[in-house]
Amino acid sequence: MSLKLAEKEQVVATLQTRLTRAQATVVAEYRGLTVAQMTVFRAEAQKQSVHVQVVKNTLLKRALAGTPFAVMDHLLKGPLVFAAAEDPVALAKLFTDHAKRLEKLVIIGGVLSGKQIDAAAIAQLSKMPSREELLAKLLGTMQAPVAGFVRTLNEVPSRFVRTLAAVRDQRAA
């Protein structure tokens, strides 16, 4: 099915707006995947706020032009699935997990912070903690000194109450 010029321009414009918000992109070969497998993959991607799209390479090259993701132009050969996301770790985990389960999904490469990365780098990125986990660790680290200070302040009245209870018990005996 060929697209009309206006439809092609709209696809390129949509991709460019998604790329402005994206921190990372990945392309993978999907030849041999069933429709059901691809549907499950897309649903999983949507849950993790990852935009996944099968798009013509020429349209994708036009969308990538003038962006930090243009370094991946030479990777765009053959039928590919393109993905972009604000969270690079979620993107990497999605592709790595599905590539393990679906041998037909082959990660070609991607871009992170304006630098091209290969499948091995994407696999390494997938092993990092997610954004939520990192924020939880940061919050715990920030709260630890305050919590310790509160416990120290609470210890003074507690010690005083225990001393009074000991004096009361001693007088009662």
From Swiss-Prot:
Keywords: Ribonucleoprotein, Ribosomal protein, RNA-binding, rRNA-binding. The keyword GTP-binding does not apply. It holds the Pfam family Ribosomal_L10. It comes from the Bacteria. One of its GO terms (biological process) is translation. The keyword Ribonucleoprotein applies. One of its GO terms (cellular component) is large ribosomal subunit. Gene3D superfamilies: 3.30.70.1730, 6.10.250.290. GO terms for molecular function: large ribosomal subunit rRNA binding; structural constituent of ribosome. Disulfide bonds: none annotated. Belongs to the universal ribosomal protein uL10 family. Part of the ribosomal stalk of the 50S ribosomal subunit. The N-terminus interacts with L11 and the large rRNA to form the base of the stalk. The C-terminus forms an elongated spine to which L12 dimers bind in a sequential fashion forming a multimeric L10(L12)X complex. Forms part of the ribosomal stalk, playing a central role in the interaction of the ribosome with GTP-bound translation factors. This is Large ribosomal subunit protein uL10.
